[in-house]
């Protein structure tokens, strides 16, 4: 009687190390206990591929996928799934940022785009049972060639398939076999290279662990085609599980008459021995491997001697890697056409190197959500591998680079994400296929340090036989180490390139000629990082500790001494913490609430736990200062006579005014609105930024000597020439970008369509605003969420936000999204408006379409495409488009030479922020387009510095003045305190108490909580 369910437990190295055999034992015991052992079979399979999620269990025939199983999960799983027929969602895979688990294996993105040729038996058979392999057509290809094909026919089929070596060189397999057969001398040897030593690579090991018989069958077919009777598998001794299964497979094949003398009675004899290598990376090179097999030191020899003619013991020898051999039985069984129609092929010439047919196995590792082993068709793009299969970058961080081809492969940037992955295209851009390692790097990876790491690795693995490799790697390692320590000098990059070229031209083996790839590719694609290390003594990724001891401070656009103020909070010296913040930031209360905190993703603690709540601690220090009535006192410079006019009182304008005022300059700010603060005052609701906090900090700006004239519109009430005539020696434009852009759909002129500013401005000015009962907000920004949450507070019964992409791609802050959902706002993802329905010139509804993501736009995000026939109508009476804004430059004098971009922003010198009009500077959203408050403040500080130098008639130095580090003694913690530490949740006003009012939602950290959170800090500054 057949089993009704097969429970396939992954028993690859990754899952075994996570105790998958204990899970298997627990399953068998529980199944027997429940008297299900006649109905349910538990099978230990090879590697499933999704290595980071082990132990893995797949239940067939449904294909239900369970992950990260523990022994304690088993009784419940057996009862629910096997007895009651209810799969267990909590044990299923849930994609990052999503909340809905995916039950079936084939529906998980990691598996969706894979095509299994070499891994065709993955997760299906017990690798320790030859019977399982035979049941999957194992050894039928061998029988076919032995009894119905001549050796030349076998070689011809392999040639037609286009199979190229998967070990790194990519030489056409069929041509290699043919050359070896024609070498004329005997004996001939067949060798499998399983000496996989690349960092982060485990393709060959996993394939042997999962399906060793496919490799043995491929080798035996190859031996028949070549005319060999002896074969060797050269495998690392640190692969114990692969070795164990390989030994078992060879013994089983011999017992079945599939290896040894007179195989299957065919008169063909062939046997295989295992040779355990010592783990030298250079022995992955064919001639070094053969030297090691012979019992000599594993050193390569000159390539003009071909191993197919003079290889092992100077005899004709054919060497292919594990993956190449595993593909051979499939090509024989299913025909060369099956293999050749997958991938890319440039020509029909069978003797050509052109094209890359079939599939390739990659180990996908590094800064990626779904790490593991994948097999994909040649020609798939890097983007599909990294984002569709790999699930993108953890923590919402930005993709930076991917290294293909192992330690001597190239590092490719984001602009090459749409590159098809095949032998030729990778070589064209300075990388290579290699054996299939693929290491993904995010924005926190320093490309100079990456190059240094791989050069150091290769330096240690070089055999030292040839001077270019031995001395070249040593010299490059020394140069790269100096650069990462901040000791680089002009000419270092050029010297690296020169050494690299010498190695490429003259090194003895492929290790030496390819070793410069990490250096050359990072120089080619990330030259600016080398320049930053050498010229500016800065590591942009905040990795090199000699240059950037504290990533948090480095990431702060204002260069605030983060560990300094966090350290003071940890010691209970809150006034000192507030003083440190104010040294670089005139708006601690504002930024403590609405800063987008780029420092937190850089926090080193975030690599192993939650990052420090840096923004919340900033707010705590500011609130403490305000509660204690501490008035900030800033030192002012000597008075100066040159007057400065600032147009706009938003964050950029007020910041520039503050620092110019402290420098002694008379500053006047002209603001169109009746209140100061710009969009801080009229664009951000009180529940996020109370007016009391905003006004307190504006008063501190005024105290520095800044005059703010509200209700004055430049270009109408006063002109540019008036400002010049009134003696202003410099003008700073900081008018922002709040002119709404149209959706481009019909009905936008109807009553009930409101621009965000038409809603938020009167609300923030205390005026009454009426919205309908059913409101639709369009967009995925923080402003869109502000509009939705404001409409909710104004009494709208239903508020729906439409966003045309997925939740993972929504630009709004995650905390804002969750707060909106908690307040009852419905968010329709993958939805876009197509028409505003109008009746009697009023909004009567909104026609929408469902979207799907297909391809990519210029920003690198997936492009939303309407799904045909997916239209539906929302019953709404108010529509608020909040998709994008642009600056309004109508106040600028016509014909005065201001350069403007195609997107209506002002062109400025990036170093000085001076416009094309002498004496006129600009910063903030009017220059960048819609940005963050922190970015505007940073540009305001730079503008103040630039204007000050301009007024003194001096050139502004490119180097920023070095800022001091505050010496704060660390708090000593007990082991018990450390164990209890975790990031606190911000106390908030309950959702049911938010409706109908604009009370602040986030309540601030209590004193004890703030101190405890500050004590979690690793205090990276102390390692300087």
PLM ranges: what are they?
Residues 643-668, 784-792:
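N-terminal Rossmann-like FAD-binding beta1-loop-alpha1 element of flavoenzymes
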Residues 643-647, 695-745, 835-847, 854-855, ...:
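Feature captures the FAD/FMN-dependent oxidoreductase FAD-binding
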Residues 787, 923-957:
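A conserved FAD-binding loop/helix module that cradles the flavin
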Residues 1-6, 18-43, 61-90, 141-158, ...:
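Ferredoxin-type iron-sulfur electron-transfer modules in oxidoreductases and energy-metabolism complexes
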Residues 621-637, 696-716, 740-794, 900-916:
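Glycine-rich dinucleotide-binding loop and its adjacent helix/turn
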Residues 749-773, 856-930, 934-935, 971-975:
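FAD-site-proximal beta/loop scaffold in flavoenzymes
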Residues 114, 243-378:
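Hydrophobic alpha-helical positions that pack around
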């Amino acid at each position: 009687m057949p089993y009704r369910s097969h429970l396939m437990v992954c028993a690859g190295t990754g899952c075994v190390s996570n105790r998958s055999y204990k899970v298997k034992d627990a399953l068998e015991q529980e199944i027997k206990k429940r008297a299900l052992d006649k109905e349910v079979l538990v099978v230990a399979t090879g590697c499933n591929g999704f290595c980071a999620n082990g132990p893995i269990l797949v239940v067939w025939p449904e294909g239900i996928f369970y992950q990260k199983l523990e022994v304690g999960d088993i009784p419940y799983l057996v009862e629910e799934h096997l007895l009651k027929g209810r799969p267990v969602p909590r044990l299923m895979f849930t994609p990052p940022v999503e909340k809905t688990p995916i039950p079936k294996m084939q529906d998980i993105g990691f598996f969706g785009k894979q095509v299994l040729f070499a891994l065709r038996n993955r997760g299906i058979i017990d690798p320790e049972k030859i019977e399982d392999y035979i049941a999957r057509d194992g050894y039928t290809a061998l029988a076919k060639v032995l009894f119905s094909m001549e050796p030349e026919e076998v070689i011809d089929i392999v040639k037609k398939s286009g199979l190229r070596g998967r070990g790194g060189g990519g030489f056409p397999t069929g041509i290699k076999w043919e050359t070896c057969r024609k070498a004329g001398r005997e004996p001939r040897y067949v060798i499998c290279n399983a000496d996989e030593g690349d960092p982060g690579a485990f393709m060959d090991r996993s394939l042997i662990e999962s399906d060793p018989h496919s490799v043995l069958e491929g080798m035996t077919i190859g031996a028949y085609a070549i005319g060999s009777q002896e074969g060797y598998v050269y495998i690392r001794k640190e692969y114990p599980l692969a070795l164990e299964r390989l030994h078992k497979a060879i013994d089983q094949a011999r017992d079945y008459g599939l290896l040894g003398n007179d195989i299957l009675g065919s008169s063909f004899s062939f046997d295989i021995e295992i040779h355990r290598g010592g783990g030298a990376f250079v022995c992955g090179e064919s001639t070094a491997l053969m030297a090691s097999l012979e019992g000599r030191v594993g050193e390569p020899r000159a390539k003009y001697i071909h191993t197919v003619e003079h290889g092992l013991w100077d005899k004709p020898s054919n060497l292919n890697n594990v993956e190449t051999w595993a593909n051979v039985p499939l090509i024989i069984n299913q025909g060369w056409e099956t293999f050749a129609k997958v991938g890319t092929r440039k020509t029909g010439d069978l003797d050509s190197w052109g094209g890359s047919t079939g599939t390739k196995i990659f180990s996908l590792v590094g800064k990626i959500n779904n790490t593991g082993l994948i097999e994909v068709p040649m020609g798939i793009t890097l983007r599909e591998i990294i984002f569709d299969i790999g699930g993108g970058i953890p923590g919402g961080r930005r993709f930076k680079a991917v290294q293909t081809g192992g330690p001597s492969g190239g590092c490719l940037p984001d602009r090459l994400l749409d590159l098809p992955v095949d032998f030729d295209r990778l070589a064209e851009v300075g990388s290579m296929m290699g054996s299939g390692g693929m290491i993904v790097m995010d924005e926190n990876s320093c490309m100079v340090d990456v190059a240094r790491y791989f050069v150091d690795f290769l330096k240690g693995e070089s055999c030292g036989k040839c001077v270019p490799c031995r001395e070249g790697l040593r010299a490059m390692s020394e140069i790269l180490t100096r650069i990462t320590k901040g000791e680089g000098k002009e000419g270092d990059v050029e010297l690296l390139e020169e050494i690299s070229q010498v190695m490429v031209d003259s090194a003895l083996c492929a290790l030496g000629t390819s070793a410069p790839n990490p250096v050359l590719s990072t120089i080619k694609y990330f030259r600016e990082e080398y320049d930053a290390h050498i010229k500016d003594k800065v590591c942009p990724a905040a990795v090199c500790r000699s240059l950037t001891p504290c990533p948090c401070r480095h990431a702060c656009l204002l260069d605030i001494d983060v560990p300094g103020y966090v350290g003071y909070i940890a010691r209970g010296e809150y006034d000192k913490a507030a003083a440190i913040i104010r040294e670089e930031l005139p708006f601690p209360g504002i930024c403590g609430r609405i800063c987008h905190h780029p420092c937190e993703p850089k926090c080193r603690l975030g690599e192993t736990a939650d990052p420090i709540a840096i923004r919340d601690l900033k707010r705590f220090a500011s609130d403490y200062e305000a509660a204690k009535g501490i008035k900030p006192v800033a030192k002012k410079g000597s008075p100066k006579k040159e007057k400065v006019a600032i147009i706009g009182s938003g964050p950029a304008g007020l910041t520039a005014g503050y620092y110019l005022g402290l420098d002694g300059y008379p500053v006047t700010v002209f603001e169109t609105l009746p209140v100061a603060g710009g969009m801080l005052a009229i664009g951000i609701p009180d529940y996020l930024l109370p007016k009391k906090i905003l006004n307190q900090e504006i008063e501190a700006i005024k105290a520095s000597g800044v005059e703010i004239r509200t209700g004055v519109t430049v270009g109408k009430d006063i002109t540019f020439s008036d400002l010049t005539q009134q003696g202003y020696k410099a003008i700073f434009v900081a008018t922002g970008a709040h002119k709404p852009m149209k959706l481009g759909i019909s009905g936008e002129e109807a009553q009930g369509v409101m621009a965000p500013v038409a809603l938020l401005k009167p609300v923030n000015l205390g005026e009454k605003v009426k919205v309908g009962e059913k409101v639709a907000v369009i967009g995925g920004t923080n402003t869109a969420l502000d509009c939705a949450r404001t409409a909710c507070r104004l009494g709208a019964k239903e508020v729906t936000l439409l966003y045309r992409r997925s939740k993972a791609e929504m630009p709004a802050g995650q905390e804002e999204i969750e707060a909106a959902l908690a307040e009852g706002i419905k968010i329709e993802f993958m939805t876009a408006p197509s028409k505003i329905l109008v009746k009697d010139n009023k909004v009567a509804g909104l026609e929408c379409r469902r979207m799907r993501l297909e391809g990519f736009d210029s920003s690198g995000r997936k492009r939303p495409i309407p799904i045909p026939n997916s239209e539906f109508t929302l019953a709404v009476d108010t529509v608020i488009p909040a998709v994008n804004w642009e600056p309004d430059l109508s106040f600028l004098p016509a014909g005065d030479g201001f350069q403007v971009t195609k997107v209506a922003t002002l062109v400025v010198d990036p170093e000085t922020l001076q416009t094309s009009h002498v004496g006129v500077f600009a910063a903030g959203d009017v220059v960048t387009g819609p940005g963050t408050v922190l970015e505007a403040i940073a540009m305001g500080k730079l503008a103040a510095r630039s204007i000050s130098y301009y007024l003194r008639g001096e050139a502004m130095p490119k180097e920023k003045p070095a800022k001091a580090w505050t010496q704060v003694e660390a708090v000593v913690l007990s082991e018990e305190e450390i164990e209890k530490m975790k990031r606190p949740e911000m106390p908030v006003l309950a959702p049911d108490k938010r409706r109908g009012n604009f009370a602040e939602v986030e309540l601030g950290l209590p004193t004890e909580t703030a101190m405890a959170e500050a004590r979690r800090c690793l205090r990276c500054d102390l390692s300087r």
